[in-house]
A protein has these predicted regions:
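Membrane-embedded beta-strands of outer-membrane beta-barrel proteins
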Residues: 1, 91, 123-125, 155, ...
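Outer-membrane beta-barrel domain signature
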Residues: 65, 76-82, 109-115, 141-146
Length: 186
């Protein structure tokens, strides 16, 4: 069990500068040890550029809706935005056995002067039998300032019947507020 309350999760290394004009978002790996060490259980088996969890968003830029305030407060809100949220707590638990793995990741951001922190939760279950691994990953994010919740449920499998043949796939269902999205990778 790894837990941290009101941690200083400052970035330990800076990111390389990348100029990206494509429609695909540039993925930066998380370099904060709490979120990068022993995080393999939360990775899903799929083709490249598929990440169900992006821990870099935890402690990222706060959501603001300055229009909710009166004129003077709106100016204060606009002029006092911060670039990153403090994290009140983060908890990660993982248990890996011979045939079943389980993990939980939760984090809650601190409230700022003109913003409420976001909440992030994820659970992972993975089982192995012979040449087959099957897993489930569920995530939930609450962003109260913009009145938005997001849920992702995914099932993944990895089948290795021989040293030269490997099949893997991923089914994903997402729900952002009341809008559904689906994904499949094989």
């Amino acid at each position: 069990l790894n837990a941290a309350f009101n941690p200083d999760f400052g970035q330990v290394e800076s990111d390389d500068v990348v100029v990206n004009f494509s429609a695909t978002e540039t993925f930066y790996s998380d370099k904060r040890p709490f979120f990068s060490e022993n995080h393999g259980l939360f990775n899903v088996t799929a083709w490249r550029f598929l990440y169900v969890i992006n821990t870099r968003r935890i402690g990222g830029e706060p959501d603001y809706d300055c229009s909710k305030f009166e004129a003077l407060q709106q100016d204060n809100c606009l002029n006092n935005k911060v670039g990153a949220n403090d994290i009140d707590y983060a908890v990660r638990y993982s248990q890996q056995e011979e045939s079943v793995d389980f993990g939980f990741l939760g984090a809650s951001e601190a409230d700022e002067n003109f913003s409420q922190g976001k909440d992030f939760y994820s659970v992972r279950l993975r089982t192995r039998k012979d040449d087959l691994t099957v897993g489930y990953l569920g995530t939930y994010v609450n962003r109260p300032v913009i009145d938005r919740t997001a849920q992702v449920n995914s099932m993944d499998f990895d089948y290795r019947p021989s040293s030269v043949l490997r099949l893997n796939g991923l089914l994903v269902h997402s729900k952002v507020n009341d809008k559904d999205g689906y994904g499949f990778d094989f």
